[in-house]
Amino acid sequence: MMTSNSLYKSINATTMRLILSCMVLVLLSITASAQEDPPRPLQVSTFQNLSFGAIIQGTTGGKIIIDPEGSRSVTGDIIPVNMGYSYYPAIFEIRALPGALINIVNGPDVLLNGNNGGTLLLHIGNSIPNSPFINTRNPASPIQVRIGGTLTVGNSIANPAGNYIGYFSVTFA
């Protein structure tokens, strides 16, 4: 036979178990949410440098243009020649997560210094693909970005024959 005191304790214990069971069920039904991982940064590497090839400059100079597809054209009295020097656009390989929006920002015009004196002005041109673009490849398969440029050449006194070298910047974001 149960006394009222032991009945009270039994009901109290049963109620506590029921409350604890409900709390456990409530806690199990709560879904945790957190902020997603930040996107991985782009990985960019130079696959090929920009090259304008060989030319013969005239008396007034002009411009040499390399488009992103690799074609070369000239203005003024510049004569394009091959002479074993190839011309081609710069190619960068980008690895990014699929769906990443990639912007290309060209740096400022730069001066290329000649080994026999003189400087040439380099303007970075358009790209293929055009900016901005969405990466559709996985990081194991890089996308190639081709960038052309325009080189301004003066007369032979201002720009004596020789090799001209310099560095330009392009930002991928």
Predicted feature descriptions by range:
Residues 1-16:
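N-terminal secretory signal peptides that target proteins for export/translocation
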Residues 29-31:
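N-terminal signal peptide c-region/cleavage motif recognized by signal peptidases
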Residues 6, 44, 104-105, 121-123:
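Generic hydrophobic, helix-prone segments enriched in Leu/Val/Ile
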Residues 98, 106-132:
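Surface-exposed binding patches on compact interaction domains or structured appendages
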